[in-house]
Amino acid sequence: MKQRLIVKTALSAAILATLAGCATQPTQEWAADTTYKLTVLHTNDHHGRFWQNKYGEYGMAARKTLIDELRAEIQAEGGSVLLLSGGDINTGVPESDLQDAEPDFKGMSKIGYDAMALGNHEFDNPLDVLMKQKEWANFPMLSANIYDKKTGERMFQAYEMFDKQGIKIAVIGLTTEDTAKLGNPEFIGAIDFRDPKEEAKKLIAELKETEKPDLIFAVTHMGHYEDGKRGINAPGDVALARYLNEGDLDMIVGGHSQEPVCMEAPNVVKKNFKPADECKPDQQNGTYIVQAHEWGKYVGRADYEFRNGELRMVSYDLIPVNLKKKVEVDGKSQRVFIESEIKEDTALLEFLRPYQEKGQEQLNVKIADTNGKLEGDRNVVRFQQTNLGRLIAVSHMERAKADFAVMNSGGVRDSIEAGEVTYKDVLTVQPFANILTYTDMTGKEVLDYLNVVATKPVDSGAYAQFAGISMTVANGKVSNVFIGGKQLRLDETYRFTVPSYNAAGGDGYPKLTGHPGYVNTGFVDAEVLKEFLEKNSPIDVNKFAPNGEIVYK
């Protein structure tokens, strides 16, 4: 905030010169030539992980212990703390999803979060669920760029002011404009997700006039893209920092891309970051940019010194929350803590336990067996055809008696390991409660549809998994299309399935809901998958292995 300091100092000097000998109230509450310590702790993309995983990693009870210890340490040294979240509290773990993330928001309140950004997955549910979640949270949910289409007014709080030892800090919230296509179209039709860069610039100008903050931070859910190279994604944190005037924004606490933002060099992200590795945040146009991967695996810690209006980052760390690694002991593989074990906070653990037990009662029932892994990892399924993507598509195709099936990879949220399969596994893979839809189209319409959907790029949730169809994709077009082993005929009619999210235009797919051949079956995707697994158990994963049906050139 160097520019503000210069203006403020010049103004103060002018007043002093004019009113020589008269006592003047300083414009700032902090003392000159005094060094203040400020620490920002942060997480993002929680996605329902209020409970530790089956290996004893992360979880909110251990996170609270860590944050309480950090707070005590920092305050003992005369420092102040802000605890921020980059959003996406919703969607990902069945025990949370079935309870509208109540344990997660109430857990965050007990941990003591100061503010969060609204993420795109906050809009997976009807708005009345989000309003209920606002009541469960004792901290503000921020977004300056979400507007009501009818009234033209902001729907959520745009910023929150904090006073830390006389330092006035404005925290603004911003949400990716991609929410318009990533959120559930059934629930966001009346919402306008405006350009967060423009809204940030406008809001910062207003804040300078009204609140006159010493520092401006942003909690964002926009994504961090190396050197701003975002592909088909909406502009992220790098683009935001570059768009603003240098010095206007001191720090971005981000989310959405679900990665550790650790840099090897300017504009070069450190590849293969591992727990306990050193992490240097990105810095763009005078703005620090941080992100703490996902799921509460880490708590980010940014230590600053503030002196005479200037902010300087002293150190940064991503602290693992009970993450483990595999080691060989006596010829057997076992998992050990990477750093010292963090004990779970007893009070929070007991508060969360009934939620966990209630969820597990419904989920831990075996429904099938599989003889191998069904691959749904986002780093695989968003880049290539996988056996799990194929299996889900086949389950939809069979239920709808369709000729082929289209399944967006963003709707495949996890893998299924070999062995017993439970309902929880199914809901972890498909947590969004999308409805199975199908559409009857002519071959010509199908070809036009595939030219949009099959050409979606890798590394995005729009990348499509297929069943019952083969084709070649090259130069933004499809060719050599075969359905059910027979070449596509433009004058024939075909039936294909697609999740309701995509049928409504999600992921930038062509909207089908107004097509005369469109049918909403009413079948929930997870239930369709569950019944398919039960019916075909034991599952032979080799039957669903891709075999070159979709060729990319």
UniProtKB/Swiss-Prot annotation:
GO terms for cellular component: cell outer membrane; outer membrane-bounded periplasmic space. Keywords: Cell outer membrane, Hydrolase, Lipoprotein, Magnesium, Membrane, Metal-binding, Nucleotide-binding, Palmitate, Signal. The keyword Nucleotide-binding applies. A lipid is attached at residue 22 (S-diacylglycerol cysteine). It is found in: Cell outer membrane. Residues 1-21 form the signal peptide. Its main location: membrane. A divalent metal cation 2 binds at residues 88, 120, 221, 256. A lipid is attached at residue 22 (N-palmitoyl cysteine). One of its GO terms (biological process) is nucleotide catabolic process. A divalent metal cation 1 binds at residues 45, 47, 88, 258. Belongs to the 5'-nucleotidase family. Degradation of extracellular 5'-nucleotides for nutritional needs. This is 5'-nucleotidase. It comes from Vibrio vulnificus (strain CMCP6). The gene is nutA.
